[in-house]
């Protein structure tokens, strides 16, 4: 039994205790001791069995390593610079590398400090960012990878270049009204633009300013407020980004307010100097991408915040610096309530697609942001409004937000571009799918954007097209932000060349190289039609628009005819016949309700033309006149009321309001027949 259990020296009968030997080590314990460290191993770290020290002498002076002599490395003797491993000696401290600590809370450049959220303009932030140092703008190093990401390569099909038809824009009429309007610029030059911005503009392959840019650049650089109307796709984004960034490069960051510092001189609150508000997530993302492009290698740090995305990542982005903020109104109000954004430093406020923001019900949030928070007053900031249309109610809103502004109208505002070939076809609802298939087979090449009215129809139509072997995707409000971004990206790069969309994608989105827009369902508002077809024919390029029309769309029939006439397009005979059939409904867009009144000066400066506008059954009406006459609803109109020649006190209509409106200055109620100028009002 003992022999069986001996197992290489494990003797159960021996009196001397033996340690347990694991099975995988048995038979290996009787060999010679290791001779030292392997050839490629550090000998000083090799400690075989023994007294616990390495293969060297025991340290002199006792058992403690504290008494051992200083270690001397092999080779070149003692290191230079003393007993340390820095061969070049201790580094000298460069205070300019970290900004001026006294300039504001958090340090660098007075713009937020290292880790602060105010901008951190005094330090290089990495990724090719520049600095603001000693009152000068120092551009960061070039980064080839970032340049390819932002600007693409020459002739990149995913980056739309300026089209050849911008040369025709010199013939488009431009109206600039206001006091002392500056002369337009004809080239991207210094002055007025900063040299660094001009380099980024060249990287983006922009050759000449668009008409709206020719006028907006000197107006904004001159310190004036601006209300600008221009054809969609005419470069409105550059119209406000170019002057804002150019002045930022020249003047540097604003110091964070003295009361902003938290514990240890840091603040997690962002203090942007420029705020750009836009109605949709896609539009703010697009503006943010453009701002990154033109702020490349500069001290300006753009940020974007919008709903439907992870707020944590947006907060972390702001903490790395936030000088130019692009936001949707809802998410901005949320971040203000959380105490993460302050508007104290705002120098520039931009409202892009302002009419769309009011249509979507954002007016309370906009008024709170502009008037109810800590934003500087109208006299202490520059305010810019940009849109393709400016109905009268928006112009009245501008009266509260803008000061001594210049009204800029480029081309036929509220109309479409002649670069777009518009076709209107009579198609009953039951036949729309088959006609759409014929169109897609005929115009197969290029990107096609199809607009529908409902979210359900967007999904249904995209599924139908996929079943017909057409690569299609859809975008609408019920899809998550990630799904919407993925659908747009697949459409942009051509993997899904057919995109079915609701109005969420219609306004302001710059999708390059869209060749064909199909209005599968016509909108009820002609402005929406303008913005939909404006997704093609952008940046001076050409495009095709096809609209499916039937008697269910007769509410926009007259406005559609007027639009086609303005753009020198062919007018189908069935449109004129249907327009004659519906003869009794007068006035502006929207039929019975009158809407905004296309003849009421949606493209004119209301300060020059006063009230008026279409409304109701042959009504005159309008949205009031100059500030002294009150607000909305002045004028004659109403059901059967006589047309009002202007808003300067016309006789009240049968049901119309006599004056004022919304508690306006000279009395009168919004449609209150008993208030002919007295103090009564329903408001």
Curated annotation (Swiss-Prot):
Keywords: ATP-binding, Cytoplasm, Helicase, Hydrolase, Initiation factor, Nucleotide-binding, Protein biosynthesis, RNA-binding. GO terms for biological process: cytoplasmic translational initiation; negative regulation of cytoplasmic translational initiation in response to stress; positive regulation of formation of translation preinitiation complex; regulatory ncRNA-mediated gene silencing; spliceosomal complex disassembly. CDD domains: SF2_C_DEAD. The gene is ded1. GO terms for cellular component: cytoplasmic stress granule; spliceosomal complex. InterPro entries: DEAD/DEAH_box_helicase_dom (IPR011545), Helicase_ATP-bd (IPR014001), Helicase_C-like (IPR001650), P-loop_NTPase (IPR027417), RNA-helicase_DEAD-box_CS (IPR000629), RNA_helicase_DEAD_Q_motif (IPR014014). ATP-binding RNA helicase involved in translation initiation. Remodels RNA in response to ADP and ATP concentrations by facilitating disruption, but also formation of RNA duplexes. Its EC number is 3.6.4.13. One of its GO terms (molecular function) is G-quadruplex DNA binding. Residues 642-653 have a biased composition (Pro residues). A motif (DEAD box) lies at residues 352-355. Residues 1-137, 582-683 are annotated as: Disordered. It is found in: Cytoplasm. SMART domains: DEXDc, HELICc. Residues 419-579 form the Helicase C-terminal domain. Transmembrane segments: none annotated. Residues 104-130, 582-602, 609-641, 654-683 have a biased composition (Gly residues). The keyword DNA repair does not apply. This is ATP-dependent RNA helicase ded1. It holds the Pfam family DEAD.
């Amino acid at each position: 039994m003992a022999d069986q259990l001996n197992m290489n020296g494990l003797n159960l009968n021996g009196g001397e205790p033996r340690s347990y030997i694991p099975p995988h080590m048995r038979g290996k314990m009787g060999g010679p001791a290791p001779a030292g460290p392997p050839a490629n191993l550090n000998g000083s770290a090799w400690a075989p069995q023994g007294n616990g020290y390495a293969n060297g002498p025991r340290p002199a002076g006792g058992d403690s390593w504290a008494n051992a002599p200083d270690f001397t490395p092999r080779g070149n003797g003692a290191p230079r610079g003393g007993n340390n491993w820095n061969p070049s000696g201790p580094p000298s401290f460069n205070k300019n590398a970290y900004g001026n600590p006294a300039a504001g809370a958090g340090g660098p450049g007075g713009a937020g400090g290292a880790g602060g959220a105010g901008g951190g303009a005094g330090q290089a932030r990495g990724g090719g960012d520049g600095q603001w140092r000693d009152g000068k703008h120092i551009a960061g190093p070039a980064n080839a990878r970032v340049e390819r990401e932002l600007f693409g390569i020459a002739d990149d099909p995913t980056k739309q270049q300026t089209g050849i038809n911008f040369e025709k824009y010199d013939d488009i009429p431009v109206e600039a009204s206001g006091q002392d309007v500056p002369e337009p610029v004809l080239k991207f030059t210094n002055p007025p633009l900063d040299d660094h911005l001009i380099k980024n503009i060249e990287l983006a392959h922009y050759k000449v300013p668009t008409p709206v840019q020719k006028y907006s650049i000197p107006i904004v650089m001159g310190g004036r407020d601006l209300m600008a109307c221009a054809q969609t796709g005419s470069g409105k984004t550059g119209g406000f980004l170019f002057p804002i960034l150019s002045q930022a490069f020249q003047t540097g960051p604003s110091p964070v307010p003295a009361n902003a510092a938290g514990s240890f001189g840091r603040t997690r609150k962002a203090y942007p100097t420029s705020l750009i508000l836009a109605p949709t997530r896609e539009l703010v993302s697009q503006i943010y991408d453009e701002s990154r492009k033109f702020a490349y290698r500069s001290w300006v740090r753009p940020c974007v915040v919008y709903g439907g995305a992870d707020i944590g990542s947006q907060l972390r982005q702001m903490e790395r610096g936030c000088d130019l903020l692009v936001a949707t109104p809802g998410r901005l109000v949320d971040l203000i309530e959380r105490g993460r954004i302050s508007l104290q430093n705002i120098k520039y406020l931009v409202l892009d697609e302002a009419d769309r923001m009011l249509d979507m019900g954002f007016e309370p949030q906009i008024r709170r942001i502009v008037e109810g928070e800590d934003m500087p007053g109208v006299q202490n900031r520059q305010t810019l409004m940009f849109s393709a249309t400016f109905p009268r109610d928006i112009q009245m809103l501008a009266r509260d937000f803008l000061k001594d502004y210049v009204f800029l109208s480029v081309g036929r505002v509220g109309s479409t571009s002649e670069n777009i070939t518009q076709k209107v076809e009579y198609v009953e609802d039951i036949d729309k799918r088959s006609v759409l298939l014929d169109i897609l087979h005929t115009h197969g090449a290029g990107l096609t954007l199809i607009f529908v009215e409902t979210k359900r129809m967007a999904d249904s139509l995209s599924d139908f097209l996929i079943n017909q072997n057409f690569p299609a995707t859809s975008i609408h409000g019920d899809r998550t932000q990630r799904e919407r971004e993925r659908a747009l990206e697949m459409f942009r790069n051509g993997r899904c060349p057919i995109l079915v969309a609701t109005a969420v994608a219609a306004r302001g989105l710059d999708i390059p190289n869209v060749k064909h827009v199909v209005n599968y369902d016509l909108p009820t508002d002609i402005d929406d039609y303008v913005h939909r077809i404006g997704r093609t024919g952008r940046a001076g390029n050409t495009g095709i628009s096809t609209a499916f029309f039937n008697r269910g769309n007769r509410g926009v029939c007259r406005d559609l005819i007027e639009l086609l006439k303005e753009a020198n397009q062919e007018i189908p005979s069935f449109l004129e016949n249907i327009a004659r059939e519906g003869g009794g409904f007068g006035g502006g867009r929207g039929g019975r309700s009158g809407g905004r009144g296309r003849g009421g000066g949606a493209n004119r400066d209301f300060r020059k033309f006063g009230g008026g506008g279409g409304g109701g059954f042959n009504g005159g009406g309008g949205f009031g006149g100059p500030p002294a006459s009150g607000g909305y609803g002045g004028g004659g109109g109403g059901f059967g009321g006589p047309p009002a020649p202007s808003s300067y006190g016309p006789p009240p209509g049968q049901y119309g309001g006599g004056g004022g409106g919304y508690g306006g200055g000279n009395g009168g109620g919004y449609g209150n027949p008993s208030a002919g100028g007295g103090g009564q009002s329903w408001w």
